[in-house]
């Protein structure tokens, strides 16, 4: 198995990161919207930590819209994960 896939599966093993990723399947979100949308009781630094972990392994992409950081699913990585599970 590819090391990047291993890191992705490990990242999704955390309940908070899994919730973040799952919410992005439905819509793109600004980093500032996660705690409200997910109703998470976590601090901004903790949220940033989890978003960074998801970005580092390639599960999510970040784009800028002015001062806002917009997060979305990395479709290429999602497809790699699907291909792995369909083998």
Predicted segment positions?
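Short, hydrophobic-biased segments on the C-terminal half of alpha helices
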Residues: 50-52
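Amphipathic alpha-helical dimerization/coiled-coil segments
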Residues: 1-5, 22-26, 75-87
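A generic structural signal for ordered secondary structure
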Residues: 1-9, 14-21, 54, 59
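Beta-hairpin "wing" of winged helix-turn-helix
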Residues: 55-65, 72
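N-terminal helix-turn-helix DNA-binding core of bacterial DNA-binding proteins
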Residues: 10, 15-43, 68-76
